[in-house]
Amino acid sequence: MGAASCEDEELEFKLVFGEEKEAPPLGPGGPGEELDSEDAPPCCRLALGEPLPYGAAPIGIPRPPPPRPGMHSPPPRPAPSPGTWESQPPRSVRLGGPGGTAGGTGGGRVLECPSIRITSISPTPDPPTSLEDAPETWGDGSPRDYPPPEGFGGYREAGGQGGGAFFSPSPGSSSLSSWSFFSDASDEAALYAACDEVESELNEAASRFGLSSPLPSPRASPRPWTPEDPWSLYGPSSGGRAPEDSWLLLSAPGPIPASPRPASPCGKRRYSSSGTPSSASPALSRRGSLGEEGPEPPPPPPLPLVRDPSSSGPFDYVGAPPTESVPQKTRRTSSEQAVALPRSEEPASCNGKLPSGTEDSVAAPGALRKEMAGMDYLAVPSPLAWSKARIGGHSPIFRTSALPPLDWPLPSQYEQLELRIEVQPRAHHRAHYETEGSRGAVKAAPGGHPVVKLLGYNEKPLTLQMFIGTADERSLRPHAFYQVHRITGKMVATASYEAVVSGTKVLEMTLLPENNMAANIDCAGILKLRNSDIELRKGETDIGRKNTRVRLVFRVHVPQGGGKVVSVQAASVPIECSQRSAQELPQVEAYSPSACSVRGGEELVLTGSNFLPDSKVVFIERGPDGKLQWEEEAAVNRLQSSEVTLTLTIPEYSNKRVSRPVQVYFYVSNGRRKRSPTQSFKFLPVIFKEEPLPDSSLRGFPSTSGPPFGPDMDFSPPRPPYPSYPHEDPAYETPYLSEGFGYSTPALYPQTGPPPSYRSGLRMFPETGGTTGCARLPSVSFLPRPFPGDQYGGQGSSFPLGLPFSPPAPFRPPLPSSPPLEDPFNPQSAVHPLPAEGYNEVGPGYTPGEGASEQEKSRGGYGSGFRDNVPIQGITLEEVSEIIGRDLSGFPARPGEEPPA
């Protein structure tokens, strides 16, 4: 180099060789105020902050090595004589101009950047500018302790092309990498005025540092970037996230002449000073940019860079795009990067430049961020919206290019198409292992092999698929531990082929129209796979290795035209495949009867196999929650049983008062863990059908075609407290019980003699004429009403056929609106009027008059008298049936008719 004279001040060797760790802070009047922060270049602005002292590196960032001698040696500056250089004060770099002097009064510029050593500089003069000399130390008096991390992109080739070298992090490095430049930001005005190679390289290096600097803010404040506070760009985040478009804050404003760059190992592109030499906006594309140069829109105003609080990595800054030195796979993908713009707005090439269509979105980052607000790092795709057919119904129509998977539920019948298993397989089959020979094809229960037939289609041959499915209570799917095995030989009549569909072996056969689209499945066996292989390969733990029951599943795709098919599927009965079960487990193939009264006692015959002399038959009932509610063992008749037949007596059901059929199950057990599959059975409620007494001439209930009793019958009650019936010639009929214990409408007949004397709560309707019909009133014919008790000699008692519950609603219509006749009962009249209001129905204590409630009026005497005499809790249906049979036992036949047999 040239002369080593310095006219500013003498050289301090302690600072040059790094012997002094920290310099005392400068006072207000120190030399740190010589450089105005407003007029200083961006690199000088960086030096005015408060750097982190050595030894106080944040967690997660490698501590830089200690300073070495020569690390802080001052860079040279141009001397007055051409071609010579002289030393600068520490931490200041002067780029000489045409009128530069040793005293710094010329037109040179002073640049002060941390960890930068200028080994050589281009002699091209700078534009004439004026700037004061830089201070000796940084604004806070701290030494320059910010070398870049090791290996930070330092793979640029050494040596200079065109006579220029560049900055290096240490004196021993001669790399030309602009990655090692450790500045913070670039000033737009300074970069616009600078036209030499050094300024262009400085612009590139400054933007590179601003995008990937690992240093946090020593002031821990996420304040916006200002020239007075350059390190606040990298303050820790307080929870908010800065816009990702802040990577453009270091871009240059206008075209600057580019300089040739040396070739790089990885085909790294050459950047110009006309724009930000970085990848495309992270809000638009995840990809890096290694293309050619192109025009770029002006950058937006500077936006803050905030450190990502959720990451501990040294390069995780929100708003900083990944650089090419960081592999693509290791970059943190934010929500803005994950959600790309429409395809038409994406960059057309990987050149790092934004397309013209996205300039507005980049210029207005707030709008783009507002659209993406509330998202996390990765954009979760919207859930797959199933069609209506998937949600319910499972439409079996598919495209030929997208057939349904094997676990897709399919019906066995669709419109006129039906896939039917004509002959079911046997309930057990000995599956063979991979290490042993074949056990043969699956047999059918009556003999032979299963038969499958397709109904509703007979146009051309179709392919029938068969696989082994599950037989548990869950949806049908391929079994993990069993698969179909192809049987071959000269005794096999059906040709088959093996195929693998989604990891499941499928046997394919042909349905021919000449065979009526039927196939005899004599070519299919069952192979047991090794448990360890399946559990390790598929992770099948929900099915379990003890699940040894399977089904034969058949599937066919019927073409429909237009590139679509209809898929139908049929599954066989469960097949037990375990070795022990084939020998010891009982199997029930048929039983009769399938229903019985709750009283039990009937004989049940089971047909099957593997029945033993000590086999047991157990009836069980489970509740809706699956818990056992009832269990009873049936008595087996050993004398009438064999290995294939069991005869037993059906036990009595636990609840005999049920009003509807009850579904229960039974199974055959040969001992512990040797049970047959459960079979369904029904218990029916008891039908009350009492036989009449021996002295009774009435074998059933009277009909409604005529009067049921003679004129001289006495129905006085022989045994209180049961009600009495009328004697003499009644013009009414006794109501009788129908199914559901309802009441039929009583028929009325005209009076032919004096009115009878009776004590009863019976109700009757008048007849409108004739002796054969029972015409009813137009609107109230279904409402029974009693005659006044005082006119017929006595007070009414309780209705003999009353029940603890009220009769059905159709038998209680509203009361008639017409007033009653003055003569309530006239022998010469053919019409019997309705009783008067306020009639004492069941006694003097009950008068449903004007003040009575509607419930009492509509209920009449059905429930009130019954509740007065017989307690509700103390009567059963059997007692009601007994009362009915006893009181109706003396009813004779109609006059002129034979008594019923």
Swiss-Prot record:
Annotated ranges, domain RHD: 401-582
Chain intervals with Acidic residues compositional bias: 1-11
Cellular component per GO, a single term: transcription regulator complex
Record bears the keyword Aminoacyl-tRNA synthetase: no
All copies of domain IPT/TIG, residue ranges: 586-683
Region annotation 2 approximate SP repeats: where it falls in the sequence: 213-293
Biased composition (Low complexity): 114-123, 166-180, 272-288
Quaternary structure and interacting proteins, as annotated: Member of the multicomponent NFATC transcription complex that consists of at least two components, a pre-existing cytoplasmic component NFATC2 and an inducible nuclear component NFATC1. Other NFAT proteins, such as NFATC4, NFATC3, or members of the activating protein-1 (AP-1) family and MAF can also bind the complex. NFAT proteins can bind DNA as monomers or dimers. Component of a promoter-binding complex composed of STAT3, NFATC3 and NFATC4; complex formation is enhanced by calcineurin. Interacts with CREBBP; this interaction potentiates transcription activation.
Localization per Swiss-Prot or TrEMBL: Cytoplasm; Nucleus
CDD domains xrefs: IPT_NFAT, RHD-n_NFAT
Cross-link (Glycyl lysine isopeptide (Lys-Gly) (interchain with G-Cter in SUMO2)): 689
Purpose: Ca(2+)-regulated transcription factor that is involved in several processes, including the development and function of the immune, cardiovascular, musculoskeletal, and nervous systems. Involved in T-cell activation, stimulating the transcription of cytokine genes, including that of IL2 and IL4. Along with NFATC3, involved in embryonic heart development. Following JAK/STAT signaling activation and as part of a complex with NFATC3 and STAT3, binds to the alpha-beta E4 promoter region of CRYAB and activates transcription in cardiomyocytes.
Record motif Nuclear localization signal, residues: 268-270, 672-674
Region (Calcineurin-binding): 114-119
Pfam families registered for this protein in UniProt: RHD_dimer, RHD_DNA_bind
Keywords carried by this UniProt record: Activator, Cytoplasm, Developmental protein, Differentiation, DNA-binding, Isopeptide bond, Nucleus, Phosphoprotein, Repeat, Transcription, Transcription regulation, Ubl conjugation
Modification type Phosphoserine: residues: 168, 170, 213, 217, 289, 334, 344
Protein name: Nuclear factor of activated T-cells, cytoplasmic 4
Chain residue ranges for the region called Disordered: 1-180, 203-361, 697-721, 791-868
Post-translational changes noted in the entry: Phosphorylated by NFATC-kinases; dephosphorylated by calcineurin/PPP3CA. Phosphorylated on Ser-168 and Ser-170 by MTOR, IRAK1, MAPK7/ERK5 and MAPK14/p38, on Ser-213 and Ser-217 by MAPK8 and MAPK9, and on Ser-289 and Ser-344 by RPS6KA3. Phosphorylated by GSK3B; this phosphorylation markedly increases NFATC4 ubiquitination. Phosphorylation by MAPK8/JNK1, MAPK9/JNK2 and RPS6KA3 may stimulate NFATC4 transcriptional activity. Phosphorylation at Ser-168 and Ser-170 is stimulated by UV irradiation. Ubiquitinated, leading to degradation by the proteasome. Ubiquitination may be stimulated by GSK3B-dependent phosphorylation. Polyubiquitin linkage mainly occurs through 'Lys-48'.
Residue stretches of each SP repeat: 213-229, 277-293
InterPro entries: Ig-like_fold, Ig_E-set, IPT_dom, NFAT, p53-like_TF_DNA-bd_sf, RHD_dimer, RHD_DNA_bind_dom, RHD_DNA_bind_dom_sf
Protein's gene: Nfatc4
Tissue expr: Expressed in heart (at protein level).
GO molecular function: DNA-binding transcription factor activity; DNA-binding transcription factor activity, RNA polymerase II-specific; DNA-binding transcription repressor activity, RNA polymerase II-specific; peroxisome proliferator activated receptor binding; RNA polymerase II cis-regulatory region sequence-specific DNA binding; sequence-specific double-stranded DNA binding; transcription cis-regulatory region binding
Known DNA-binding region: 430-437
